[in-house]
A protein has these predicted regions:
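Active-site glycine-rich loop that binds ribose-phosphate moieties when present
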Residues: 140-144, 148-150, 172-196
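Short, flexible loop segments at boundaries between secondary-structure elements
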Residues: 145-161, 289-305
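Intrinsically disordered or low-complexity boundary/linker segments at protein termini
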Residues: 171-176, 302-306
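Short acidic/polar capping segments at secondary-structure boundaries
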Residues: 123-126, 160-161, 169-172
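Contiguous, glycine/small-aliphatic-enriched amphipathic segments in soluble metabolic enzymes
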Residues: 1-138, 185-267, 271-278, 282-284, ...
Length: 372
């Protein structure tokens, strides 16, 4: 790896939200510019408007193409050339279009290898459209532009928890039908590979959550654990993936068991997001796994209710910047090691100690817990 600073593309998000406030506050600290070269894909006029309206201490240089970005400063790339009306705190079609145009330009520039990592400010999917089609979120858009048919995985990343979900946003009544052995194996395998490559953990342990509140034979509320989830865990073990479970979510998080694992695979969206938000208190990051581009985002909304008030907390956005830098370094080192492997001097001996350690404890039939 060379000593050149990481080139970080940053999309401005919904122009009526808190995107520019987060960006300018994050890079107000000079040491942030020592870590990377930020290239903000946005509108120079909108950026200047927010800087003046909130008296933000931000200096930026306007550029027309990413190749012109220089180290030691905020580079504002004019991805949105037309006039954009700013109406702080109000989601409009115009503000949504500006968000998508910045992201689209960033996708084009990544194909041309003009930056290393991508950090996105929040977008509102309800007012973002692409030539008449609804915007389904950053992950879906990146899959469409760069995935070449592959599907990504959204991982919520905090200080003590990484969690992903087998299914995406669905009505709860449809979740069970969408959970299959194949899907669990696919998501868990990608999760494990991502933790190894992008988070520098050589042999990650994955906890798999149960779908139903109770999952032992006597008190189970459903058959999905026995018929789908446990067979999937067994198949993962055969592939060399350290997957354990299934664990009922209430006890798993209530007892702090998540701290024993490198990743947690939930069955549905809210089973992942509810404990994550409670544990991370607004400082969490969304990581898009399985795509060529390293993309992170603060796990927050566009913040219309506080837009323009200069009260937005940039902690999660700064964490997204840090995570993008860390994962780029880890991925680069991992890929370099894979391209130039050292000869193996010994072979690892596997045993069942880990499997025993993380096994679900059997409850006695007459115990109070078994009767609940």
């Amino acid at each position: 790896m060379d000593n050149k600073k990481i080139r970080m593309a940053i999309t401005h998000g919904d122009t009526n939200g808190i995107g520019y406030e987060l960006i300018f506050k994050t890079f107000a600290e000079p040491e942030m510019l020592e870590l990377c070269t930020p290239i903000v894909y946005g509108s120079p006029k909108v950026a200047a408007y927010y800087r003046k309206a909130m008296n933000l201490p931000a200096q930026f240089s306007i550029i027309q193409k990413a190749e012109d970005a220089e180290e030691g400063r905020i580079n504002l790339l004019a991805a949105v050339e037309e006039e954009v009306k700013v109406d702080m705190g109000v989601p409009t079609e115009e503000s949504g279009q500006a968000a998508v145009k910045a992201l689209d330009r960033a996708m084009t520039d990544f194909r041309d290898d003009l930056y290393d990592v991508l950090v996105t400010a929040p977008i509102n999917s309800q007012n973002a459209f692409i030539e008449g089609f609804a915007f389904k979120g950053h992950k879906h858009y990146i899959e469409t532009c760069l995935g070449e048919g592959k599907k990504g995985l959204s991982i919520l990343v905090g200080d003590t928890l990484r969690i992903a979900s087998v299914t995406e946003k669905l009505p709860l009544k449809e979740v069970a039908a969408q959970i299959t052995v194949e899907k669990i194996v696919e998501k868990a395998t990608l999760f494990q590979q991502t933790i190894k490559r992008d988070f520098n953990i050589s042999n990650p342990r994955i906890a798999v959550l149960a779908l139903n509140p109770k999952n032992n034979e006597e008190t189970s509320c459903g058959n999905e654990e026995k018929e789908i989830i446990i067979p999937a865990i067994d198949e993962l073990a055969g592939k060399g993936v350290q997957a354990f479970g299934p664990y009922p979510a209430d006890d798993f998080f209530g007892n702090g068991d998540f701290r024993e694992f490198d990743g947690v695979l939930a069955m549905y969206h809210d089973q992942a997001t509810a404990p994550f938000k409670s544990i991370n208190d607004g400082r969490g990051v969304i990581y898009t796994a399985g795509m060529p581009v390293i993309r992170t985002s603060a796990d927050i909304t566009p913040g219309y209710e506080i837009a323009g008030t200069n009260t937005a907390d940039e902690s999660a956005f700064r964490n997204a910047v840090y995570l993008a830098i860390d994962t780029f370094r880890y991925r680069s080192s991992y890929d370099e090691a894979c391209e130039n492997p050292l000869p193996k001097l010994f072979h690892e001996k596997r045993d069942d100690s880990e499997k025993v350690r993380f096994a679900i404890p059997k409850k006695k039939a007459d115990s109070p817990e078994a009767k609940r």
